[in-house]
Amino acid sequence: MKRISVLFLTLCFAGLSAFAQKDNKALKKAQTLYDQEQFFAAGNAFLEVSKDKSLKDQKEEIQIKAAQAYLKGFQYKKALSVYEGMVAAGPKNVEVFFMYAEALRSLGQFDAAIAQYNKYNEVNPGNAQGPSRIKEIGEFKEGMNKPTRVKVTNFGRFNTRFHDYGANFYKKNGIVFVSKREEAAGKKPEAGTGEKFSDLFEAFLDKNNKWSSPTPLKGMINSPFNEGAASFTKNGTQAYFSVADKTGKIYLYVSKRASADWEAPEKISFFGDTVMLANPYLSNDGKTLYFSATNAPGGYGGIDIYSAKRKGNGWEDAINLGPIINTSNDESFPVVHESGDLMFASKGHTGYGGYDVFRSSMKDGSWSAPKNVGLPINSTADDIYYIANPSFSRGFLSSNREGTKGGFDVWEWEITPLEFNVLVTVKDDSTGKILPNATVKLYLLPDSSFRDGMTDEKGQIKFKLKSNTEYALLVNKDKYFGNTGSVSSKNEEFSKNFELTIGIAPIPPQTIVLEDILYDLNSANLRPESEKSLNILVDLMRKSPNLRIGIYSHTDSRATDRYNDSLSQARAQSVVNFLITNGIDSARMVPKGLGEQKPYTALVNGKMELLTEAFILKQPKDKQEALFQLNRRTELEVLGSDFEGNIKYKRVSGEEDSKGAGSLFEGRTGGDDK
């Protein structure tokens, strides 16, 4: 991993703890390089000084400084090499075991890191950091095995073998990012790295979804020195960024443009220019400026995030965001979403290694506890400059994770859209045979709008579903009773294809006896035990909304014809009334009392017999009542399947597509086009 210079990525301004130094010029030079944030050169210088025998009493401390310098410059492998040598020699400072473990973790060497954390726990019992880090590694490894909808890919078209980072939305269809590529301004290389100084570059997405080649921002915004990531006003006419001057000091600047060219930047001062500032980000309403600083008033240690309110043409005094956001470690790279949420990178909050991205919301004047945005946005490396479109479905981040072309690269992230489908297969309930040309209706609950279609030659039909939605299905076919099914995408976190088989029963040509439809003696009142069978009939009618039926009631022969006809008609009407009460259209039902006109045919003594009164009275006395009971029955006959009735539900044409990830530049209207 290459070193990225100065405050733009590390913001580690804190001076090193004072050495009990001898008058050693090489050591002083190494310290000066560190103070100038030339961390790569400082690490090399400290490492060389550690070989000086005259400083043998300070050797371990100087080696720690070398490793720290490499870490500040994101040179984890070099830092790791220093720690390995110290551990092999047996360090006096037990913190070396922890530092070594941290470097191993940042490089993804988890088992080795756990071994060093355990060693640290042995030599420093009761510490909180070691066990916490081991737990974090376990959570990271567990999280890596979990499925996710977030896809992170290297934005290769813009990345080079140099540092490319800090992408931000610009105008309607562009981005601006920082790069140290060959096209950057400035003829002199940066001390310590030999690389170009960083500049701000722009690129635009055209109507054909093609990106233009990155070019430096026009005008006077780029200097011969390092420019940091930029934030823009909504109309795109002001840019806020940080610049390192020739002395290595870093401050905030604003540049304005009235046309295509940017004007010379003007310094924005806070704290009387006594501290260095970086990573400015302007709120969507342009009224609040967020930035990073250290050694500033009200700090909590390490790097902190501050904000300042606009006041006329200037700014009020900056204030620290407080201990909910800032820790004793480093918090930096603030980004403010259109929603007002704050995204920032932290080494102090619980994470996976290096800088992790966190998100916090303003509620009742206070920031909520920061939430780690999770894998794979975060990694064991450093993950910073996280930006998102309005729907939080797409955006960019910068990272030096595995797969980078240079030290830091721009990465694009996207939440893949949820996609749900249901494949319905319709079969004959009795034979299992597939049924083409069956009508399947998919009802959206709870409003019951529906889409419908016919099964194909395989007896199947496919529907797209919305996310977090419940559906009911209704299947009908000529000469078959209908049936229902259900499918739900509620609480489904990932795309899914549902499969559902619904069987429907053929309508028999003869009438059907409705079992257990019972009445009070000599009455049309339905007995309570009839309700179960009646509810089954209601369900059948609901599942077959086009069905028309006849309800036929029969009596036995032990009364006058007139009495039996009247009683059976009333009983048939009672059944129809029950169905009407339960929402079945009366126009679909014909009640008819048949009295004793149609005796039942039953199997008696091995033969099918018509249960006339004469036949029953010839049977043994103990059998006669049961045979009379068979005649007292209620039957159903299907009269047709052509009922249309009143349209209660709205048919929806076409398919319901799942929501996509949204445009990268959705809702952007600020600034002119390219």
Tell me what each language-model feature is:
Residues N24, M99, S106, F110-A112, ...:
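Short, conserved micro-motifs composed of acidic
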Residues A30, F420-D429, I502:
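A short, amphipathic beta-strand motif
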Residues G302, T431-L445:
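Short, ordered, surface-exposed loop/turn motifs in non-cytosolic proteins
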Residues S346, G351-G353, H554-K674:
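Periplasmic OmpA-like peptidoglycan-binding domain that tethers envelope proteins to the cell wall
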Residues L444-I461:
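Short, acidic Ser/Thr/Gly-rich low-complexity loop/linker segments typical of extracellular
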Residues T469-Y480:
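A short, solvent-exposed beta-strand micro-motif common in secreted/extracellular proteins
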